[in-house]
Regions:
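Structural signature of tandem alpha-helical TPR/SEL1-like repeats
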Residues: 20-33, 55-64
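Terminal, low-structured helical/coil segments at or just beyond the last alpha-helical repeat
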Residues: 62-93
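Canonical positions in the second alpha-helix
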Residues: 1, 33-34, 67-68
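Residue-level recognition of tetratricopeptide repeat
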Residues: 7, 41, 75-76
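Structural marker of alpha-solenoid helical repeat scaffolds
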Residues: 3, 37, 70-74
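Canonical tetratricopeptide repeat
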Residues: 13, 47, 81-85
Length: 93
């Protein structure tokens, strides 16, 4: 990041590290940075949607699923998984 602050991959890896450490705030910050650098980064959209499901921010999840629908090339099956997790989270509320 020091040598190339526009490296979306570096921020994505940082987000994954913070996910493992269960630091939701820093995970979200880094995922948002990835999406600022590349709004079509499917993995960042997916991880941010999972984080928002965990935090019960369901309107944001729906928005992210719609975004994933429009940019999807490699992770198209992930949108079905997200939709399923969203539905089960909504039922448990």
């Amino acid at each position: 990041i020091v040598f190339n602050p526009k490296s979306e991959i570096s921020y994505l890896y940082l987000a994954k590290i913070f996910k493992e450490e269960e630091n939701d705030g820093l995970e979200e910050n880094n995922l948002n940075t990835v999406l600022l650098l590349n709004p079509k980064n499917e993995e960042a959209i997916y991880l941010l949607a999972l984080l928002n499901i965990k935090n019960s921010n369901f309107s944001k999840v729906k928005q992210l699923i719609n975004t994933l629908n429009t940019v999807c090339k490699k992770m198209c099956s992930s949108k079905l998984e997200l939709q399923s997790k969203l539905e089960s989270s909504l039922k448990s509320e």
